[in-house]
Swiss-Prot record:
It comes from the Eukaryota. It catalyses: RNA(n) + a ribonucleoside 5'-triphosphate = RNA(n+1) + diphosphate. GO terms for molecular function: RNA binding; RNA-directed RNA polymerase activity. Belongs to the RdRP family. It comes from Arabidopsis thaliana. Probably involved in the RNA silencing pathway and required for the generation of small interfering RNAs (siRNAs). This is Probable RNA-dependent RNA polymerase 3. GO terms for biological process: regulatory ncRNA-mediated gene silencing. It holds the Pfam family RdRP. Its EC number is 2.7.7.48. Residues 88-113 are annotated as: Disordered. Keywords: Nucleotidyltransferase, RNA-binding, RNA-directed RNA polymerase, RNA-mediated gene silencing, Transferase.
Length: 992
């Protein structure tokens, strides 16, 4: 490189820049064919600002279509940025301010690589400067004095701009420092957000959002720049968030790189800078830590993310507010940090490394128990034996087991577990006190513990997942786990390393949901001999009853509990609110549309059918074709159909004998809601049913007499695919820490960008081939044979693809199995769709031709009890302003064009207002008395309905979304009607 001016020494050696900055300079030289290097003064300016600002400056230069003077343009962009001690950054290894745990290192990488060793300068190294005779504080340094929530909000409101004096001064930031969060947000929005963001990006906080998980988001562009979003609030949290704290976890989304479907190797070069240097959030650095592949849920996810979520965690910080408190991962590598969660270094392959580690991302509820006082026992799995009592081996040569994923927990520990948990969230109590609603969500004194608990355990380096069966025979404070449940073992060489020990509850065995059929299940039942009239009769009866939804409390209540996404509509009906109440009538109209869409897809209710969690029989008394089913009334007897979603094979529906097992009561007592499978036979019954196991899988159980009369079972599925390939790559323990991070990040990028949706494609092609197959007669034997052969191939591919993420396998869909024409009810392409005459096509057409008449909209009026009750003017004034703010926020959220994101934003707005109203996540968690809530709910109701009278019934929604439980209780109080206690599930049963 040529020298500049009369200097005899290369300016690069005199003024040292970070490797990432040098790399960006080289790119600029190459793109713009700039032969002369930048001047010493320009290098000095670049060295005087943070790495983040220097890179942002050079990106702006790089993106210019042409350059006149490179030095002049850089100096223009740098003007006003933070100066570091008024002098150039020292060369690597010479900084006087270093972390005692992480000495600065010299980078030995080639010039095109990006350095990851150098840290952001310490605040001690960033001083106030004289600026025209007055002192000022650099904005970035001032930001480091704010609590993280405030700092992140400010960064999100500058829309990706650099935090420089031209944007906002450090002194102004300090003036906002002590403002309450609501006032702070308003000030920052008025000064910055309105200028740099669109209205939909505003995040108006409410006081009292504590207790909810804050998800801080970052969006990374292909040029390496990034913008901050959020934060989003949720009632559920992950083990990762609970251990580190919400502000130390960053959810990161990467923009799609054009052409990566065919050039996946280009991905890492695009995002290498982020992988190496991490993401700077002010003066905090966050690095890649973990990602989770959606796997089985992938088809349901937002296609823009393909079900893959990526998380970075904070490593180090030079923010003054952070320097006051020690941070466990300061100066540690990501691999070292992971060891505090589980000893993933013991795993044999990289795919296993990340799939196991992602267990910390499950949405869970922590069991509040002292882990040091629990006895952990390892018991053997129950092996499958042949007629000679020898172990049966699977296609990979491993023993088949009956107990895959299930163990035991002592009764005292099970009683400590909260009931009615689903995916880490406390569901509303299933006990509805009709005419006297009881929403406390607590069972009666002495309530039985959950029969089954789906969980995650992190303990001394171990990671365990599966289900616990409550076992009254175990001594107190004891859990028993099997090898099939242990996903990560302890590394005894790390015995002195502290670990984040916890028992996390995912889901408990809850009262069964209203069972509905599905397209897959209808197709398999039809193949098994169930006549079309069986399905069509149920369908017609359901459609006829739906006609009375606006006039019959029975029909309205059934629709509310079957199709409502909350319980408030059902509550309104149960307390006697008239069906023509404007909001309730509008909700019933919505439920009618929801029901019709569900019926079109074959999702209609079926009598005497349930979805319940499965486990293995602890007594050993059940025979090969027997199961034990415990429902509300206890154990049932007789033949039942058993199926598991998303089964596609003809033999995925079994006919089994439900058997009473007296000895089981000695284990579980009176606990309810589970199905027990035998521990006898050459193959697990759970595995025979769509490859199921007992780590939380839900099984469809039906004792519907007409189904049992007609259905003829087929032979169960046996995989015909080849044995899994043996992993030949290097073990995680054989990689250097730098190599490990690079490989893990590449795995994430491939999962995020390069993977075809084989699961969804195989399922769609299966249905497209299966549909005509159902209508073929014996005269079409050859076509039936060919179609069945392809169906079986697709089933193998589908099941292999479901398990691929955790095995690191690659599954492809051969072109000869891909189809272009689909049945019309799938609504893919009207020009290509064929007219289906199968039961699925008949179901779709029957619903489509059924025009339910809806009554005309009612004039909006208030309920007399709510309008007549006096409400303090102070409450009316408060909620008038409150409602105006809500409408403003909701209109901004509705501007989002992406449906998934829009729903997320609108739900967040509603949740935050509920949090503010109750001082908690909802009514069930609130410590406020009803006497305090009644006048506030009535004020909100009257304010909202006054507005709705002018603007339409849709505006009524807010009052019920927020204050619905309180309004129902108040209405019941005013009617002075008698009440009875009833369970939702029992009401469903009584109503048919």
């Amino acid at each position: 490189m040529m020298n500049n001016g009369c200097d005899e020494v290369s300016p690069r050696s005199e003024i040292a820049l970070l490797g990432s900055v040098e790399t960006m300079l080289e790119k600029i030289y190459e793109k713009h064919n700039h032969r002369l290097p930048i001047s010493v003064e320009t290098r000095r300016k670049l060295s005087s600002i943070s790495e983040e600002l220097a890179l942002e400056t050079l990106r702006k230069v790089f993106n210019k279509p042409y350059l006149k003077t490179l030095d002049g343009l850089i100096m223009y962009f740098v003007k006003g940025t933070v100066t570091v001690d008024g002098s150039p950054r020292l060369s690597p290894g010479e900084s006087p301010v270093q972390s005692p745990r992480t000495p600065a290192k010299k980078s030995c990488r080639a010039s095109q690589d990006v350095s990851l060793d150098l840290e952001t300068p310490s605040p001690k190294f960033m001083k106030r400067e004289e600026n025209g005779g007055s002192k000022y504080i650099p904005p970035l340094l001032a930001l480091g004095e704010l609590e993280f929530k405030k700092a992140f909000l400010l960064l999100s409101y500058i829309g990706g701009e650099s935090l420089v004096e031209e944007v906002i001064s450090g002194d102004q930031i300090r003036k906002w420092k002590d403002l309450p969060m609501v006032s702070y947000e308003a000030a920052v929005w008025n000064r910055l957000g309105q200028r740099y963001c669109s209205p939909k990006e505003r995040r108006r906080p409410l006081e009292g959002d504590s207790g909810m998980t804050h998800y801080y988001q970052c969006h990374v562009a292909t040029d390496g720049s990034y913008k901050f979003k959020g934060h989003l609030l949720e009632n559920t949290g992950t083990h990762l968030h609970k251990v580190l704290g919400d502000d130390n976890v960053l959810t990161v989304k990467f923009d799609k790189v054009l052409g990566v479907e065919t050039y996946c190797n280009d991905l890492y070069s695009t995002y290498k800078g982020i992988a190496k240097n991490g993401i700077m959030v002010g003066l905090r650095r966050y690095r890649f830590f973990v990602f989770k592949d959606g796997g089985k849920e992938e088809k349901k996810k937002d296609v823009s993310t393909k079900g893959v979520k990526c998380y970075f965690i904070r490593t180090d910080s030079t923010a003054s507010i952070d320097m006051q408190n020690p941070y466990i991962f300061a100066g540690k590598s990501m691999h070292e940090a992971r060891m505090h969660f589980m000893h993933v270094n013991t795993l044999s392959s990289l795919p296993n490394y990340m799939s196991r580690f992602s267990l910390i991302l499950s949405k869970t509820k922590t069991l509040e128990v002292d882990m040091t006082g629990i006895t952990f026992e390892q018991i053997d799995d129950i092996h499958c034996h042949d007629q000679d009592d020898k172990d049966v081996l699977d296609k990979n040569g491993k023993p088949c087991i009956h107990s895959d994923g299930t163990g035991y927990i002592s009764e005292d520990l099970a009683r400590m577990c909260p009931v009615n948990i689903f995916k880490g969230k406390s569901m509303r109590s299933n006990n509805i006190q009709s005419k006297n609603l009881n929403f406390e969500g607590q069972g009666p004194c002495g309530q039985e513990p959950p029969l089954l608990i789906q969980f995650r355990i992190f303990y001394n380096g171990y990671a365990v997942k599966g289900t616990f069966l409550t076992n009254k025979k175990l001594p107190p404070r004891t859990v028993q786990v099997r090898p099939s449940m242990i996903k990560v073992y302890e590394d005894r060489t790390l015995s002195n390393l502290s670990t984040f020990n916890s028992l996390e509850v995912v889901t408990t065995s809850n009262p069964p949901r209203k069972a509905r059929l599905s397209r897959n299940l209808v197709a398999l039942l039809s193949y098994g001999g169930v006549p079309n009239d069986f399905f069509l009769n149920i369908l017609r009866n359901t459609l006829e009853e739906s006609k009375t939804i606006f006039y019959s409390e029975r029909a309205a209540f059934k629709a509310a509990i079957n199709y409502g996404d909350d319980q408030y509509t059902a509550d309104m009906i149960l307390v006697g609110i008239p069906l023509d109440e404007p909001y309730l009538k509008d909700r019933l109209s919505y439920l009618l549309k929801t029901e019709r869409n569900a019926l079109k897809a074959g999702r209609f209710p079926i009598d005497e059918s349930y979805y319940i969690m499965g486990t293995v029989d602890p007594t050993g008394e059940l025979k090969e074709n027997e199961i034990c089913v415990i429902l509300h009334s206890g154990q049932i007897s007789g033949d039942v159909l058993v199926y598991r979603n998303p089964g596609l094979h003809f033999g995925d529906i079994h006919v089994l004998k439900a058997t009473y097992v007296k000895a089981l009561e000695d284990y579980v007592g009176n606990a309810k809601f589970a199905v027990f499978f035998p521990q006898k036979g050459p193959r697990s019954l759970g595995d025979e049913i769509a490859g199921g196991d007992f780590d939380g899988d839900m099984y469809f159980i039906s004792r519907n007499p007409k189904l049992l009369e007609h259905f003829k079972p087929s032979e169960p599925w046996v995989s015909s695919s080849k044995p899994s390939k043996i992993y030949c790559g290097r073990k995680p323990s054989e990689l250097s820490e730098e190599e490990l991070e690079e490989e893990l990040f590449k795995m994430f990028l491939k999962a995020r960008f390069c993977k075809r949706d084989v699961i969804g494609m195989a399922a769609d092609c299966w249905l497209g081939i299966m549909d005509p197959f159902l209508t073929l007669g014996d005269e079409s034997a050859k076509e039936k044979y060919e179609r069945k052969k392809n169906i079986l191939k697709l089933i193998d591919i589908y099941y292999d693809a479901l398990d691929a993420p955790k095995k690191g396998a690659k599954v492809d869909l051969p072109p000869d199995l891909e189809i272009k024409n689909f049945p019309h009810y799938m609504e893919r392409d009207p020009k290509r769709d064929f007219r289906s005459t199968s039961i699925l096509g008949l179901i779709f057409d029957t619903v489509d031709s059924h025009n339910a008449e809806e009554p005309p909209p009612s004039e909006i009026s208030k309920l007399w009890y709510f309008e007549d009750e006096p409400v303090p003017k102070s409450h009316m004034d408060k909620f008038t302003s409150w409602y105006e703010n809500y409408r403003s926020e909701m209109s901004q959220a509705m501007m989002e064009t992406d449906k998934v994101k829009r729903n997320q934003l609108t739900n967040e707005v509603i949740q935050r207002y509920k949090q503010d109203f109750y001082g908690a996540a909802g009514f069930e968690d609130s410590n406020k008395s009803l006497e305090e809530l009644y006048p506030q709910a009535l004020a909100l109701y009257n304010v909202v309905y006054d507005y709705a009278i002018q603007e339409g019934v849709a505006k009524c929604t807010f009052a019920w979304n927020v204050a619905g439980p309180v309004l129902c209780k108040f209405y019941l109080k005013k009617t002075k009607d008698k009440s009875v206690v009833a369970s939702t599930s029992v009401l469903k049963k009584l109503l048919g």
